[in-house]
Structure formats: structure tokens, C-alpha cells
Amino acid sequence: MKYKKEREEMILQYSSSGIYDYEYFRDIPDEKNATPGKAMYLYMFRKNSANINSSLSQIFSATILNLALKGVLTFEMVNDKEVRIYISSGSAEKLNTLERDEKLVYELISKAIWGKGYTTTKEFSRFASREYDLVYSKLNRIDNTVEDILEETGKISRDKKAVAKKWSKKQIGYFTGAFMIFMFMPYIPAITIGLVLLGISARKNAVCFSILTDEGEDEAAQWKGLKKYMEDYSLLNEKQVPDIVLWEKYLVYATAFGISDKVIRQLKMVHPEMFEARDDYNRYTYWNMVSSPRFNSNMFNDFSRDLGRVYDRARNAYSAAHSSSSSGSGGGGGFSGGSSGGGGGGGGSCGGR
């Protein structure tokens, strides 16, 4: 028992160090296994959690771009307003290489495309409005799916997670006990105050340390460094003409982070030659959407935003349907709609990380 307590105290102490930091990071972290969902989870991670549901529109859009880079989907630019999305021929063999969060998105696209052979963002939005339960519930599994993957791959510590859960349960117990005593035995306030103080202490222990392993902390810092690199690109005075294949990958994560507009503007300022007409668009996955003079200059951003609205449509329809049913039964408020970005992890009471 004594050993177990000492081990928990060691985990709490060790987990508050926050030893990793990168001003800029130029590679895709853990590129072979990276997905927009995992990137956003680690980027948004605060203390002991990361609620990415508030960013599902961006994650959904970025995942579709990434599936195209992996050869699972194909885009066809019909005109300035319409992009068709196809399942690529031979994609069945590639499905086993996808991460589970990517498969959730792929399954939705397969259903939206079924029977016609392709879909567009408008058709996909109509599908999401009809099948809102399916779309909303499947995409809201991304958060837990990503967390499970990160735990399985050693980036979230099972030990730290268990300690955090234990302190969360204690916190609930202390506050519940304080409330019950206040209600039924108000003449002994000392016990109520003591339980409240214990609850506050338990909450601090639950939220004020990171459940990430060293590897997870390092990768989280790398994602922050990559985002900053993309945001500050025009300030870095990099002379070499960028590799378009690499920047297509960057744009996946710029889309997930919600900064693709800014990144493209900076590229145009520093390397306008990347946006001139070229004969080799077929070498790339979607660079013609970014730079081809045949299409409007905002086509890529319009396309990625329209993809994000697919999830928004499903969420709004789900909210309306479930709010009306819960209000009819007097339950109210059955839908949380997605939390504030990044799960603040206990706010200012934790101090710096």
C-alpha cells in the first residue's frame, strides 16, 4: 500500500515538468503514423486531457485530404465550384494501412458515394443532413479512438491515466459528501469545509499533471513547433523553393489547425513561382486546387471549408432533433455540441506546465 502511494506521488511530481519545447519543427511528427485526429489531440492537449470535438469540422476536412494523399480517394476538379470525390481504384488493399480514426471518415464517404460512384461537397452535406445520427455519432468517436491509439502506442501512460481517474473519482466523492452533509447536517460545517478542501485537492491532482509519456510530450511539442513554422514561414527567409509534395502534406495539417488560408498566403508572398501555370499537376494530389490559374484562387480553401460544413450540418441536425425530443420529455440540454478547444485542464489553478 505504501509503495502504491509513493508511486502515485512520483507520477504526479514527474508529470508536471513540461520538458519539451521546439520553437520551429519542419518535419511531420511520426509521419508514417500521423493523422489529423492524432495531431489535433496532441496539439490541443492540456494537462490531462484534450477534447477535440470542437475541432471535428477541421479534422474531418483534413482527414479527407490525407486519404487522398494516401491514394484512397481521388479528387476531380470539374469547375470553379465543383470537386468530385471518388474512391480510388485499388483502394481496398490500402484500407488495412489506415488508422482507425481515418477509417471512421472513410466509412462515411463510402456510404455517401454508394450507388453513384462519387460525391461532391454539396451532395455530402445533403447526405449529412439526412443521416445526421450516423455522421454525428461516427465522427464523435474520433476523440476516444485517437486517445485509445495513443495509449496503445505508448504516447499516453496507462499508469498516469489510472491515477488521474482515481483522483477524479475521489473529487466527485468529496464534493458529493460535502453537499449531502451541508443539506442534512448543516450544524457541523467543519466537516463540509473539510470535504470541500479535500475535493479541491483531489481536483488539482486529477487535472494538474500530464498523462502523456515522454514520447507523447515530445510529439505534442513537435506539432506545436510545426504549426508555428507554417504560421511564421514568410518571416524565416528560407530561400530554397519548397517541395510541393511536402507542402501538400503540410496543408493537411494546416487545415486541421485552421490556418491553411494563412499558410497559402505566405507561400504566395515568398515563392510566387509555386503558383504559376505548370504542366505537371498530375504528379500531385490536389496542388492544382491550390495554384492552377484555371480555377479560382480560393478553391482549395473553399473546398476544405465546404468539407468541414458536412460535419456542421450533421451536428446541427442532430442537435435540433435531440433537443426537441429531450425538451418534450422534460430532460432538456441533451446535446453538448462540442467543448471549448483543448480542454483547459483545470485552468489557472494548476500553474505553468
Language-model-derived ranges and their functions:
Residues 4, 15, 21-25, 44, ...:
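Compositionally biased, intrinsically disordered low-complexity regions enriched in proline and serine
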Residues 1, 163-212, 301:
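Alpha-helical transmembrane spans
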